[in-house]
Amino acid sequence: MGKAAVMKKCIRVGDVRKDVREIAEFYFDLDNKTNFTTYSVLCSPLIVSDECIGVIHCLNKKTNNKLFEENDRKLLETLSGPAALAINNAKMAKDLVDKNRMQKEIEIVGEIQKTLLSQNKKENFPIAGINIPAKVVSGDFYNFSELGDGKYGFGVADVSGKGIKSSLLMSKASSLYRCLSKTMYSASELLNLLNSEICETAARGMFVTMLIGIYDSKKKELLLANAGHEPPLIFSKDGKFLNYTEAGPPLGIMSKIKYKETILKFSESSLYIFTDGITEIKDADGNMLESDGFKNYIKKYQHTPNYERLNKIVEDIIKSGRIQKDDLTIVVVDGV
């Protein structure tokens, strides 16, 4: 069989007892192990586009002498072509069905992921978010909610890597955050607990960057804690940008780390939290948008309602001809 596959031609061994010694010894060895007697052999490769996808292997003709003749070789050679095409077409059809089924399953995962993201509230709500996946599923997530007494919680995260593995870790991290953030009002303690859980279960080499916070509209304060996430931008009422750079390592790397939180005065300003898909998106020449480019879009639409503002910013970024290869996620918190 191997010789037929390598040479890509039909081979007949008329009588193994009279043919070349190595072939005879090969079949005699098999016969001794199986109690079968080999008299004659036909092997024809199945060729599609000059590639061997298999071999038809025939033993012993159903005649008295059990020996294949040259006409048998020619017949098998003729039949092998259509057989190869039929087998290849069947395989392609199965692959297409499997691919369509997997694509449908991925789309379902994508739809489930969308339900994990907070929905924007259009009337006087200080927080809005947007997520545009690079593919059907995303490795980014955000969440925000009203905690009561003028307080609002929010979180943005980016899972390392891309694809299904990243989206599954994202789903776990977002579910943990949604559950724990309802009862924990310390940003640092919440990160500590999330980190412990992710360290126990995340696949080796995977991690999550995350920034979480609480906005107190009565005290006009921001409580922030950062686990290796992109430094957020604060756009103040006087038109200047302030950077919050304090951060610990990403979640899932160091199980014993203790995260710190910072309290900032926050009045008549906007906090922009985003993933690196925003600042690292490139134009046709390979130039990244970077922080300065993002700031220009913020300035352009700052006086637009927050949910419209984010849509316009992302729309402009994509319309500028930049090529999206990563998820785009932004959350804005507007201070009163």
List the predicted regions and their residue ranges.
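Signal-transducing coupling segments at domain and membrane junctions
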Residues: 14-40, 61-62
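Acidic/proline- and glycine-rich, intrinsically disordered low-complexity segments
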Residues: 1-17, 244-247
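Active-site-proximal, acidic helix/loop segment immediately C-terminal to a metal-coordinating Asp/Glu
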Residues: 69, 164-184, 242-245, 268-321
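Short alpha-helical interdomain "coupling" segment at the junction between an upstream regulatory sensor module
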Residues: 71, 85-104
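A short, aliphatic-rich beta-strand micro-motif
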Residues: 39-48, 54
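Amphipathic alpha-helical "output/dimerization" segments
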Residues: 48, 66-88, 171-175, 267
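Short beta-strand-to-loop transition segments that serve as allosteric relay/switch motifs
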Residues: 55-66, 159, 336
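… and, occasionally, acidic/histidine-rich disordered N-termini of signaling adaptors
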Residues: 97-272, 322-336
